[in-house]
């Protein structure tokens, strides 16, 4: 999750399953986009999707071949215990569950343990 007007460094690139330019803000988000673009079950990928009535965006929203939505939030392992991170992740989860996403279709992508 990021602020909707995040001013940090981003990588702009073209991804086959993403309309227009895909903007990724860190290596975790970029790698997840690569993995999802190779997945045959994914029909479309959307990056940095604005959550209405909030100042934040969800990292990745996928439309699967059966037209269900799957939401991915990217989080680094060392940040996951922070109260602010937990609050924002909970806010994202509640937002998407309120918009018809199933519990198992809201997912958290975490970097590998070192």
Feature-to-residue mapping (PLM):
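Electrostatic, structured charged patches in enzyme active sites and in nucleic-acid/phosphate-binding
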Residues: 1-114
């Amino acid at each position: 999750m990021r602020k909707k007007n995040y001013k940090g460094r981003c990588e702009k690139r073209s991804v086959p399953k993403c309309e227009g330019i895909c903007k990724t803000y860190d290596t975790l988000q970029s790698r997840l986009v690569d993995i999802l673009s190779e997945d045959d079950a994914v029909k479309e990928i959307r990056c940095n999707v604005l959550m209405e009535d909030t100042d934040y965006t969800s990292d990745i929203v996928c439309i699967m071949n059966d037209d269900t939505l799957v939401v991915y939030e990217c989080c680094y392992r060392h940040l996951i215990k922070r109260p602010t991170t937990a609050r924002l992740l909970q806010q994202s989860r509640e937002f998407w569950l309120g918009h018809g996403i199933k519990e198992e279709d809201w997912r958290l992508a975490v970097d590998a343990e070192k």
